[in-house]
Amino acid sequence: MVAYYKAYGLNCNPMSFDKECELTNAHFHKNKKREDIKSHHYIISYDPADVTENGLTGKRAQAISLELAKQMFPGYQALLVVTHTDGHNESGNIHTHIVINSVRKTAVERQPYMDKPHEEAAGYKHRSTDKFMNTFKKTVMERCQQEGLHQIDLLAPAERKITQKEYMTQKPANKSQVFFCRFFKLFN
């Protein structure tokens, strides 16, 4: 698998992301139990046709995803781990993995998708609500249009939904996935 490996950190150093998240969690007395959600993982995936038709590269996808992460995860420690440039099973779909600490490090301006009191405050735990996800999807779609990239309607329901477990059992593991799984064990 070919990948554009360049780790970027938001509100953290990418090389010490795990330790910095632990310090933030301890500071706000959060994520003390093993079963607490310590991180959230998001994937921004691009149309394979954008490579040949619109000149999308791993570097450009990484830059777009970094801007989206800054916009959608303000105040959180976030790590853009890797942009895969040949997709899973050589499908050609470039995609970027974003991991955020579940605890907001710094206070931010209130965002339209925030519906709980004090959700913008430092120490607040991220909630992947329908309102947030719809805002995130809409933002991704708008950004892809601005960049002249293909974009499906992410707000339309999928014809067939499968669970993450079903998805993972349908395809063989590769070295990147093994690395990524080991990486996540640091946070959970």
Predicted feature descriptions by range:
Residues M1-N188:
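N-terminal nicking endonuclease/strand-transfer module with a His-rich metal-binding environment
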